[in-house]
C-alpha cells in the first residue's frame, strides 16, 4: 500500500509538476506577447511623434519664413505614410522628406543665382548707359559729319541760285535798255510801259514777281546750272513784236525782191484750221493759195507799206505770249 501510495504521489507530483510547468509556460506566454506588443508600440511611437511634430521654420536670406500659405498644409504627410506599413513605410517617408528638402534647396539655390544674374545684368546696363561705347561715339561723330556736309551743300546751292538770279537781273536790264523805246517828246515810253505792266499785274500773277516792272516774257530766258542764257529766236520774235514793221523795212532796204514772211502774230496767222468754204479751200487746183481766213494781214498790204514805221504800245506784244 505504501508503495502504491508513493507511486501515486510521484505520479501526482509529476502531473502537478507537469501541470505547473504547463501552467507556467502558459503564464509566461501571455507575458512575452505583451512585451512584444509594447516593443512594437514603442518602436512605432517615435515615428508618429516625429511625423506630428511641426517642421522647423525655414528662412531665406531676407529673413522671411518660407511656409505654405494654407494652414492645413503645414502638417501634410507624404503618400507613402498612408500606403506603407512598419519600418519600411517610415524609411520611405524619411527618404521622401529628404528628397523634397533637397529639391527645395536646389530651387532656392537656382533662385539665388537668377537673382544675382539679374543684379549683374542691371549693373551692366547701368554701366552701358553711363559710359557709351566707342561704337556709339563713332556713330554720333559720323552723324555730325554728315549733317555738316549737308549744311555746306545747301549753302553752296543757295549761293549758286543767288548768282544765277543776279545774272538774270543784269541780262534783263541790258535787254530792256536795248529794246524799249526811248522817252519821246510826247511823253510816251516809260510811263506807258509802267501802265501796261500794272494792267498785266492786275490780270494775272507773274512767274517772276520781282521782275514785274519789266515787260519781258520769262520764256525768253533759259536758266541752266551753267548760267542764264537768252533764247535768240524768242528775242528775235520779241524784237519784231516791239517793232513789227522794222524787220520788213530792213528786208525791203537790203533786197527789194525778197519774199516776205508771215508775221505769226495777227489773228489769221494764229488760226490753225482751214475754213473749207472759201474759193481757195474749194479749188484744190490752186493748192499754193492759203485759206483766205488764214492769210496774214501784213502780207495783204503792198510792199511799199513796209517803209512806213508803225509803233505799237510798249508791252503789247507780250500779251500774245500769255
From Swiss-Prot:
Molecular function as annotated in GO: DNA-binding transcription factor binding; methyl-CpG binding; sequence-specific DNA binding; zinc ion binding
Biased composition annotated in UniProt, kind: Gly residues: 1-10, 87-97
One GO CC term, this protein: cytosol
Binding, Zn(2+) 2: 275, 278, 281, 291
Compartments, record wording: Nucleus; Cytoplasm
GO terms (BP aspect): negative regulation of transcription by RNA polymerase II; regulation of generation of precursor metabolites and energy
Domain of life: Eukaryota
Cystines in this chain: none
Binding site for Zn(2+) 1: 263, 266, 269, 296
Region (Disordered): 1-100
Record keyword Transport present: no
Pfam families documented for this protein: zf-CXXC
ZnF (CXXC-type) residues: 256-297
Keywords: Cytoplasm, DNA-binding, Metal-binding, Nucleus, Phosphoprotein, Zinc, Zinc-finger
Motif mapping: Nuclear localization signal: 257-262
Residues recorded as bearing Phosphothreonine in the entry: 53
InterPro entries cross-referenced by the UniProt entry: CXXC4/CXXC5, Znf_CXXC
Composition bias type Low complexity, residue spans: 11-20, 28-52
Binding partners and assembly: Interacts with DVL1. Interacts with RBPJ.
Functional summary from the UniProt entry: May indirectly participate in activation of the NF-kappa-B and MAPK pathways. Acts as a mediator of BMP4-mediated modulation of canonical Wnt signaling activity in neural stem cells. Required for DNA damage-induced ATM phosphorylation, p53 activation and cell cycle arrest. Involved in myelopoiesis. Binds to the oxygen responsive element of COX4I2 and represses its transcription under hypoxia conditions (4% oxygen), as well as normoxia conditions (20% oxygen). May repress COX4I2 transactivation induced by CHCHD2 and RBPJ.
Domain observations: The CXXC zinc finger mediates binding to CpG-DNA.
Protein known as: CXXC-type zinc finger protein 5
Organism this protein belongs to: Pongo abelii (Sumatran orangutan)
Amino acid at each position: 500500500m505504501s508503495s502504491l501510495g508513493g507511486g501515486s504521489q510521484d505520479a501526482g507530483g509529476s502531473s502537478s509538476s507537469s501541470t505547473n510547468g504547463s501552467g507556467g509556460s502558459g503564464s509566461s506566454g501571455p507575458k512575452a506577447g505583451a512585451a512584444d506588443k509594447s516593443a512594437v508600440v514603442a518602436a512605432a511611437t517615435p515615428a508618429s511623434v516625429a511625423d506630428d511634430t511641426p517642421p522647423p521654420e525655414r528662412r531665406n536670406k531676407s529673413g522671411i519664413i518660407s511656409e505654405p500659405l494654407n494652414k492645413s498644409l503645414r502638417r501634410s504627410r507624404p503618400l507613402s505614410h498612408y500606403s506603407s506599413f512598419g519600418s519600411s513605410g517610415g524609411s520611405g517617408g524619411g527618404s521622401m522628406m529628404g528628397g523634397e528638402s533637397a529639391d527645395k534647396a536646389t530651387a532656392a539655390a537656382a533662385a539665388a543665382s537668377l537673382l544675382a544674374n539679374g543684379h549683374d545684368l542691371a549693373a551692366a546696363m547701368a554701366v552701358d548707359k553711363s559710359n557709351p561705347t566707342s561704337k556709339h561715339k563713332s556713330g554720333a561723330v559720323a552723324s555730325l559729319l554728315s549733317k555738316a556736309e549737308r549744311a555746306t551743300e545747301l549753302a553752296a546751292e543757295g549761293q549758286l541760285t543767288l548768282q544765277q538770279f543776279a545774272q538774270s537781273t543784269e541780262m534783263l536790264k541790258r535787254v530792256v535798255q536795248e529794246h524799249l523805246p526811248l522817252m519821246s517828246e510826247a511823253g510816251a515810253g516809260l510811263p506807258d510801259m509802267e501802265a501796261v505792266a500794272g494792267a498785266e499785274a492786275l490780270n494775272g500773277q507773274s512767274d517772276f514777281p520781282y521782275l514785274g516792272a519789266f515787260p519781258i516774257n520769262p520764256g525768253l530766258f533759259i536758266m541752266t546750272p551753267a548760267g542764264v542764257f537768252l533764247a535768240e529766236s524768242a528775242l528775235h520774235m520779241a524784237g519784231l513784236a516791239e517793232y513789227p514793221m522794222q524787220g520788213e523795212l530792213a528786208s525791203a532796204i537790203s533786197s527789194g525782191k525778197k519774199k516776205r514772211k508771215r508775221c505769226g502774230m495777227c489773228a489769221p496767222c494764229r488760226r490753225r484750221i482751214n475754213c473749207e468754204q472759201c474759193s481757195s479751200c474749194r479749188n484744190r487746183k490752186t493748192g499754193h493759195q492759203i485759206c483766205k481766213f488764214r492769210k496774214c494781214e501784213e502780207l495783204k498790204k503792198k510792199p511799199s507799206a513796209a517803209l512806213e514805221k508803225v509803233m505799237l504800245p510798249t508791252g503789247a506784244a507780250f500779251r500774245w505770249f500769255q
